[in-house]
């Protein structure tokens, strides 16, 4: 008999999108599921949607709590999980019908601690497609470093099937952003973690709506993301310098530059101190920005470190068209 898989779905004010998400879960070809819907103090009808679906499918268990944030909600899901494997799913995303079956069979065949796949971003505000592959090639991690790189192909906890005994003592920490990257960093750094395998196919559909957390205008939390990504970089490169190729520092600095460049002149004045901090951060991490095999990244890193205001000007001009 196939092992039980637990799906953890934090729910918060997603009544509009939740039915499509649940339809994709309940319609999986892999059917031995524990589906945990944890309502985090929603103020819309999300909880009613959860209960409606629970009445239709006895695999669904609904839990309610006062608003505590996504990290505590996911942690509660780990505590409640009784499956051999655990998967996290955001309540406004959806997954293809054979995702769980494909990841489960890969995990079992490879004796993998984590089986992963890619994701496809679907932007409801504009036409985008960040992943065009239709093949299902597989990367089998042969050691901890290869496995860690495979796991971190997608930084977040979604599109992954974790062994429950691997993550049962690993917590999502309470940051506003990048807490999911830190969780996976701690998974990779765990003594229990040995192997991950990756199907290079986007079974997971990541939906981008107006107001999505990392698609908003410049906010202070982007500086917090820089500090969290710095912590992850330090932890991972202690295991192997190969983790520098993930470009954690480069991505975090680039995000702030791009968000700041998109601001109006008045808004730029408002966030001048934050951008000054970002430039200082880039100088302090110049080795991480410049030690890359990718020529484009190296040039971009050099510009951010040595002539950041010129680089900002070119970004702003490009955004204005």
Functional labels for PLM-detected ranges:
Residues 13-27:
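Short, well-formed alpha-helical segments that are part of the catalytic scaffolds
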Residues 24, 39-48:
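A conserved acidic beta->alpha catalytic loop
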Residues 65-81:
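Glycine-rich, basic loop-to-helix element that forms the pyrophosphate-binding segment
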Residues 86:
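Short aromatic/hydrophobic "clamp" motif used to bind/position activated sugar donors
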Residues 99-174:
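Flexible acidic/His/Gly-enriched loops in nucleotide-sugar-dependent glycosyltransferase catalytic domains
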Residues 143-219, 224:
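Conserved nucleotide-sugar donor-binding catalytic segment
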Residues 202-209, 215-246, 250, 254-285:
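Catalytic core of nucleotide-sugar-dependent glycosyltransferases
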Residues 234, 263-321:
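Membrane-interface aromatic/basic loop that binds lipid-linked glycans or pyrophosphate carriers
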């Amino acid at each position: 008999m196939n092992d039980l898989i637990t799906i953890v779905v934090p729910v918060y004010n997603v009544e509009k999108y939740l039915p499509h998400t649940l339809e994709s879960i309940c319609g999986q070809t892999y059917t031995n599921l524990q589906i945990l819907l944890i309502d985090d103090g929603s103020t819309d009808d999300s909880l009613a949607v959860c209960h409606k679906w629970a009445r239709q499918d006895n695999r669904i268990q609904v839990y309610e709590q006062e608003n505590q944030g996504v990290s505590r909600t996911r942690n509660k899901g780990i505590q409640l999980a009784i499956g051999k494997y655990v998967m996290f799913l955001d309540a406004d995303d959806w997954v293809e019908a054979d995702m769980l079956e494909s990841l489960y069979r890969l995990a079992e065949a490879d004796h993998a601690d984590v089986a992963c796949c890619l994701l496809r971003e679907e932007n409801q505000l504009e036409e985008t497609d960040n992943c065009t592959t239709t093949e299902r090639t597989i990367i089998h991690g042969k050691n901890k470093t290869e496995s860690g790189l495979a796991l971190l192909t997608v930084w977040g906890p979604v599109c992954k099937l974790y062994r429950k005994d691997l993550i049962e003592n690993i917590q999502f920490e309470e940051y506003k952003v990048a807490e999911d990257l830190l969780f996976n960093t701690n998974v990779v750094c765990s003594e229990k973690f040995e192997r991950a395998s990756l199907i290079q196919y986007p079974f997971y559909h990541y939906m981008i709506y107006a107001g999505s957390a990392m698609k908003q205008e410049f906010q202070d939390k982007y500086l917090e993301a820089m500090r969290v990504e710095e912590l992850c970089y330090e932890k991972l490169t202690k295991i192997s310098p190969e983790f520098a190729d993930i470009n954690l520092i480069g991505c975090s600095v680039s995000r702030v530059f791009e968000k700041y460049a998109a601001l109006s002149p008045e808004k730029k004045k408002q966030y001048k101190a934050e951008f000054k901090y970002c430039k200082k951060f880039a100088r302090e991490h110049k080795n991480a920005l410049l030690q890359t095999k990718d020529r484009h990244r190296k040039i971009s890193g050099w510009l951010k470190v040595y002539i950041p205001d010129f680089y900002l000007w070119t970004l702003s001009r490009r955004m204005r068209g």
